[in-house]
Amino acid sequence: IVAAHDIPYAATASIAYIEDFIAKVKRASEVDGPSYIHVIAPCPTGWGIPVDETINAAKKMVDCGLWYLAEYYDGEFHLNRDPKEFTDVSEYLRCQTRFAHLTDEDIEHIVEGRDAKWAKIRREWI
């Protein structure tokens, strides 16, 4: 949505990939005009994970492909991380109490959605 307004800089980031996050904050601070960074930072209480698993949960989300690391600048999207293979989505989901109700069929549907999203990203951004 932010990119649709053609702002000078937008990005997605994760607390699990801190070097990437820092680089994006630096780039955003150097842009003339508005910038936006959407950061995934798990909430232990809301997600139903132990506090000491926060970074690991954020890493699993990126590694299983449910969150991507990208930037938008000069009117184009740029993928910062394009994994050849994804880790198991069910491992990411099942470690959180908020997803305890999901069936195997539900998770398969999520995987199908992830695969469709990544096919579009790779087709249009790379």
Residue ranges: model-predicted function:
Residues 43-126:
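Flexible, low-complexity linker and terminal segments
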Residues 28-36, 57-60:
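Short, structured secondary-structure boundary patches
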Residues 17, 40-45:
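Glycine-rich beta-alpha junction loops
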Residues 1-31:
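Conserved thiamine diphosphate
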